[in-house]
Amino acid sequence: MQPTRSVRPFKVVSDYSPSGDQPTAIAELAGRVNAGEPDVVLLGATGTGKSATAAWLIEKVQRPTLILAHNKTLAAQLATEFRELMPDNAVEYFVSYYDYYQPEAYVPQTDTFIEKDSSVNAEVERLRHSTTNSLLSRRDVVVVSTVSCIYGLGQPEQYMNAMVALQVGMQINRDTLIRKFVSMQYQRNDVDFSRGNFRVRGDTIEIIPMYEELAIRIEMFGDEIEALYQLHPLTGDVVRKMDAVSVFPGSHYVAETEVMQRAIGTIQQELEERLAVLEREGKLLEAQRLRMRTNFDIEMMQQIGFCSGIENYSRHIDGRDAGEAPHCLLDYFPDDFLVVIDESHVTVPQIGAMFEGDSSRKRTLVEHGFRLPSALDNRPLKWNEFTERVPQTVYMSATPGKYELGMGDGVVEQIIRPTGLIDPAIVVKPTKGQIDDLLEQIRIRVEKDERILVTTLTKKMAEELTDYFAEAGVRVRYLHSDVDTLRRVELLSELRAGVYDVLVGINLLREGLDLPEVSLVAILDADKEGFLRSSTSLIQTIGRAARNVSGEVHMYADVLTDSMKRAIEETDRRREKQVAYNTEHGIDPTPLRKRIADITEILAREGEDTKKMLEGRGGGKRSPTPNLRREGKAAAGANELETIISDLNDQMLQAAGELKFELAARLRDELGDLKRELRQMEKAGHLS
């Protein structure tokens, strides 16, 4: 079945119009893309509005677009920006849905098998399903993704074939529809009505699709669909009446019965062939292990059409040949889609590296009888497979890599900022007395309520420098690879909010950090040639001071290295061009002011939801928070649960107000569990 996609124009909605270098860059990019050039490079200086340029480019060329970022944080930032710029179009967010993921692995040296362990983020899983739903049902789609988009995903044809289209007046037997939902990997649950489940009440079926927040009610009269409604799953309030609706599967790995039977047959055939090889090599333990694990999976697939780790059998389900590339998100796009690779100097090498890292782990599992050889074909795409699937690519970076520069026919430059801000002045200073000099520079900027970034070469130096500054009375923090993602975001928000003034880091102060309050970037040991002090790294680090009117970069070095020369020359070239443009057009640089977004927004929504729920139940009087041990929660009655929820909500909002975000996040999760428990009690009729 070929998808029928609705057509709606891409449209940018903004109070601003393209300015600076943006109009020229947009026109040249659109011209090259429309002319069919496969690779186009945008060299855009930090803070010149590359994201907005990409949005206006999409509006010009009217193509479904995949935007690739090199980590989840940047992808989330881009998705937010594009949703604001294109509110009438489908802007989707597609990243790995694991909050925590430990892949299965085997360590032969210690004979240790590590079971797959993971924690799935339900909201991110919904967004992934929302992405594929949008791609198969409409053309005006922008997907912001990480390298997750090159990993195996179910076959789009099977996903489409499993979809059920419902409309008022349609003839279908109720039991047939129920069986259809089960085959689509939805579960019947008349008590816990949540995403991925459906419930049946007489001639009424209600289902919450994996990609939706609202439920669908199907009212039947005999074998005819009498009415279709979209409703709030908690309150049951009807949001709107519908004439027709399509429900997509609850899993990307769904397959029809005939397909699954064929797959089971080829899995059994491969198992026999592999067992013969292992036994011939005298690997009897491995053969027995493989036989037990695979037969268990086959039995699960025969009984329920699914098994844990079914993606490892995707080659059989898809009917692919050995070594053939898996289906992935790219296959869900129309043929004429566009790819925009953000921070391409980092993202391009990342895409190319995914395959080897994945296959080396799986080869060990196959050799020791934990998986069939076909599991090797559940993998990310190789670089050449990625480029074969992508019709046209726009590479965006302030420092494009050699690969991108070699692919594009000259770069499109975007150097002039809409705000008139110019690249920071660079000052090279000797290393002797560098710490005392830096301390003096910090004090000057703190008096002006400005922020400072300091980048070092080692974690030890970052820690010692942080301690030294703290003893000198400086409000300082440091950022390194051991700091988890949530804490990194919090640290950056706290820096912008003025909770502290100086952030010390190593390699984390480069791409994508949007910190307009930073007026000084200090680079220690700038003359130590290497990855952290290459011209690319230096230019990216310099860019962190480019969003402030009085931005400066101080490089502490005794020798002017080639990398430093290239970085300084390129920055001076851009700065000269920017100053000339401002002078010609009479522009005064204006400081960039961006909203400081953080976890408090999520917590505020959680607090509002709690307030509404308690008001709906009449509320509960406040009392000290009881012990929250598991057995305490289980024994708590409805009134006690309400009291706990109310107190936890207050504690969560108080923690957020005190900027204790990790505590607030833990309280939010505990609050969510308790509210689910109370709602389930209510649905089950256990509340008076």
Curated annotation (Swiss-Prot):
<dbReference type="InterPro" id="IPR041471">
    <property type="entry name" value="UvrB_inter"/>
</dbReference>
<keyword id="KW-0963">Cytoplasm</keyword>
<feature type="domain" description="UVR">
    <location>
        <begin position="642"/>
        <end position="677"/>
    </location>
</feature>
<dbReference type="Pfam" id="PF02151">
    <property type="entry name" value="UVR"/>
</dbReference>
<keyword id="KW-0228">DNA excision</keyword>
<protein>
    <recommendedName>
        <fullName>UvrABC system protein B</fullName>
    </recommendedName>
</protein>
<dbReference type="Pfam" id="PF04851">
    <property type="entry name" value="ResIII"/>
</dbReference>
<feature type="domain" description="Helicase ATP-binding">
    <location>
        <begin position="31"/>
        <end position="188"/>
    </location>
</feature>
<dbReference type="GO" id="GO:0005524">
    <property type="term" value="F:ATP binding"/>
</dbReference>
<keyword id="KW-0547">Nucleotide-binding</keyword>
<dbReference type="GO" id="GO:0009381">
    <property type="term" value="F:excinuclease ABC activity"/>
</dbReference>
<comment type="function">
    <text>The UvrABC repair system catalyzes the recognition and processing of DNA lesions. A damage recognition complex composed of 2 UvrA and 2 UvrB subunits scans DNA for abnormalities. Upon binding of the UvrA(2)B(2) complex to a putative damaged site, the DNA wraps around one UvrB monomer. DNA wrap is dependent on ATP binding by UvrB and probably causes local melting of the DNA helix, facilitating insertion of UvrB beta-hairpin between the DNA strands. Then UvrB probes one DNA strand for the presence of a lesion.</text>
</comment>
<keyword id="KW-0234">DNA repair</keyword>
<dbReference type="GO" id="GO:0009432">
    <property type="term" value="P:SOS response"/>
</dbReference>
<dbReference type="GO" id="GO:0005737">
    <property type="term" value="C:cytoplasm"/>
</dbReference>
<dbReference type="InterPro" id="IPR006935">
    <property type="entry name" value="Helicase/UvrB_N"/>
</dbReference>
<dbReference type="Pfam" id="PF00271">
    <property type="entry name" value="Helicase_C"/>
</dbReference>
<dbReference type="InterPro" id="IPR024759">
    <property type="entry name" value="UvrB_YAD/RRR_dom"/>
</dbReference>
<dbReference type="InterPro" id="IPR004807">
    <property type="entry name" value="UvrB"/>
</dbReference>
<dbReference type="Pfam" id="PF12344">
    <property type="entry name" value="UvrB"/>
</dbReference>
<feature type="region of interest" description="Disordered">
    <location>
        <begin position="607"/>
        <end position="632"/>
    </location>
</feature>
<dbReference type="GO" id="GO:0009380">
    <property type="term" value="C:excinuclease repair complex"/>
</dbReference>
<dbReference type="InterPro" id="IPR027417">
    <property type="entry name" value="P-loop_NTPase"/>
</dbReference>
<dbReference type="InterPro" id="IPR001650">
    <property type="entry name" value="Helicase_C-like"/>
</dbReference>
<feature type="short sequence motif" description="Beta-hairpin">
    <location>
        <begin position="97"/>
        <end position="120"/>
    </location>
</feature>
<dbReference type="GO" id="GO:0003677">
    <property type="term" value="F:DNA binding"/>
</dbReference>
<feature type="domain" description="Helicase C-terminal">
    <location>
        <begin position="434"/>
        <end position="587"/>
    </location>
</feature>
<dbReference type="InterPro" id="IPR036876">
    <property type="entry name" value="UVR_dom_sf"/>
</dbReference>
<dbReference type="GO" id="GO:0006289">
    <property type="term" value="P:nucleotide-excision repair"/>
</dbReference>
<keyword id="KW-0347">Helicase</keyword>
<keyword id="KW-0067">ATP-binding</keyword>
<dbReference type="InterPro" id="IPR001943">
    <property type="entry name" value="UVR_dom"/>
</dbReference>
<dbReference type="Pfam" id="PF17757">
    <property type="entry name" value="UvrB_inter"/>
</dbReference>
<comment type="subunit">
    <text>Forms a heterotetramer with UvrA during the search for lesions. Interacts with UvrC in an incision complex.</text>
</comment>
<keyword id="KW-0227">DNA damage</keyword>
<keyword id="KW-0742">SOS response</keyword>
<keyword id="KW-0267">Excision nuclease</keyword>
<comment type="similarity">
    <text>Belongs to the UvrB family.</text>
</comment>
<dbReference type="GO" id="GO:0004386">
    <property type="term" value="F:helicase activity"/>
</dbReference>
<feature type="binding site">
    <location>
        <begin position="44"/>
        <end position="51"/>
    </location>
    <ligand>
        <name>ATP</name>
    </ligand>
</feature>
<keyword id="KW-0378">Hydrolase</keyword>
<dbReference type="InterPro" id="IPR014001">
    <property type="entry name" value="Helicase_ATP-bd"/>
</dbReference>
